């Protein structure tokens, strides 16, 4: 005769008064290995260097410290804290409604460009004043020159068409005593990017650019509204201005959008084929790559590459090209980077 079965204890119903904590999406650790912004932000350490950040720190739905990335003031102070803590920038501010870029992604572009130069230098990143970099459209934030000089001691020339942005960037450079390593220049002719900007005898090891990616203000506004919706901040009763996400018109859009800007940059770069070793630009839309490849062939670029980057769930890339042969690249290295 079989023994009676012991009944299984009934499962307890979950306490409806204590909802389960949301599981935070896992972020891929895909920043450049030399990028200083690996892992989560240490907010207590950031607040120690920049006390005004404290009032912007919140607890996100996953129970982690963060900031409200939809708040321009919070993002601006957060960037100030990052630049001070990681790059020694003591004074940094930008005018209201100007682009306030994410620092980790900007640092990635710098580090991958350093790898590009290392590929011409036996795997060693050239450092110091022997490297000159042109930042095309530096913006009011001047972030690329600040990071590039802090990390590699490179010298920079930042170009910009907006006089207000030039004045803001100059204030940052002067207040941090960086006048000798970061120079600024306004492009007076809005129809050109490089033509009319560079002076006779100037040579650059790199150019870099974060081009405007929208083709109209309407398109830029829609892009801003998508970001608001992604952050759960969209208000269907009120039309959100594009500048809520930061950025003047010249920073966000140009006629023809990113594809036209980049193809014009490529066409103009051919005029400076032996004044620059590597030209480069960010490309936000992968769909623009075929047109860019066509423009590179038309301009006569001898070598080009697409470098993919990833910051968490965001994918980005830059295109780099040169008009110099391998032997000319080695001559450039010997003349500029090899210490006599």
Swiss-Prot record:
Region of interest (Disordered), ranges: 1-36
Annotated gene: rlmF
UniProt record similarity statement: Belongs to the methyltransferase superfamily. METTL16/RlmF family.
GO biological process assignments: rRNA base methylation
Annotated compartments: Cytoplasm
Gene3D superfamilies with a match to the protein in the record: Vaccinia Virus protein VP39
Keyword Transferase recorded: yes
Assigned GO CC terms: cytoplasm
InterPro entries with a match to the protein in the record: METTL16/RlmF, rRNA_lsu_MeTfrase_F, SAM-dependent_MTases_sf
Record Pfam families: Methyltransf_10
Predominant localisation class: cytoplasm
EC number in record: 2.1.1.181
Known function: Specifically methylates the adenine in position 1618 of 23S rRNA.
Catalytic activity from the UniProt record: adenosine(1618) in 23S rRNA + S-adenosyl-L-methionine = N(6)-methyladenosine(1618) in 23S rRNA + S-adenosyl-L-homocysteine + H(+)
Name of the protein this chain belongs to: Ribosomal RNA large subunit methyltransferase F
Matches recorded under HAMAP family: 23SrRNA_methyltr_F
Organism: Pseudomonas fluorescens (strain Pf0-1)
GO molecular function: 23S rRNA (adenine(1618)-N(6))-methyltransferase activity
Transmembrane parts of this sequence: none
Swiss-Prot/TrEMBL keywords: Cytoplasm, Methyltransferase, rRNA processing, S-adenosyl-L-methionine, Transferase
């Amino acid at each position: 005769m079989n023994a009676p079965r012991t009944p299984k204890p009934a499962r307890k119903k979950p306490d409806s008064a204590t909802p389960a904590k949301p599981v935070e999406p896992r972020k891929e650790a895909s920043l450049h290995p030399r990028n200083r912004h690996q892992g989560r932000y240490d907010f207590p350490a950031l607040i120690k260097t920049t006390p005004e950040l404290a009032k912007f720190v919140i607890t996100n739905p996953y129970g982690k410290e963060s900031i409200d990335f939809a708040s321009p003031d919070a993002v601006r102070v957060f960037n100030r804290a990052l630049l001070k803590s990681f790059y020694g920038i003591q004074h940094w501010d930008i005018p209201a409604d100007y682009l306030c870029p994410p620092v980790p992604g900007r640092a990635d572009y710098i580090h991958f460009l350093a790898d590009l130069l290392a590929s011409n230098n036996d795997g060693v990143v050239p450092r110091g004043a022997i490297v000159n970099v042109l930042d095309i459209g530096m913006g009011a934030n001047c972030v690329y020159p600040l990071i590039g000089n802090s990390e590699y001691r490179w010298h920079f020339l930042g170009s910009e068409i907006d006089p207000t942005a030039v004045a803001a960037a100059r204030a940052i450079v002067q207040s941090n005593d960086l006048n000798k390593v970061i120079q600024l220049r306004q492009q007076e002719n809005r129809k050109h990017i490089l033509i009319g900007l560079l002076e006779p005898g100037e040579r650059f090891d790199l150019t870099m650019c974060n081009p405007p990616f929208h083709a109209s203000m309407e398109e830029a506004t829609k892009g801003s509204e998508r970001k608001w919706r992604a952050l759960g901040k969209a208000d269907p009763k009120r039309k959100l201005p594009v500048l809520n996400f930061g950025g003047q018109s010249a920073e966000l859009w140009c006629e023809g959008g990113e594809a036209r800007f980049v193809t014009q940059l490529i066409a103009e770069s051919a005029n400076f084929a032996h004044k620059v070793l590597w030209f480069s630009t960010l490309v936000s839309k992968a769909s623009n790559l075929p047109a860019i490849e066509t423009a590179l062939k038309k301009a006569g670029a001898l070598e080009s590459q697409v470098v993919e980057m990833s910051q968490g769930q965001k994918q980005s890339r830059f295109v780099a090209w040169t008009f110099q042969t391998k032997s000319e690249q080695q001559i450039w290295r010997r003349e500029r980077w090899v210490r006599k």
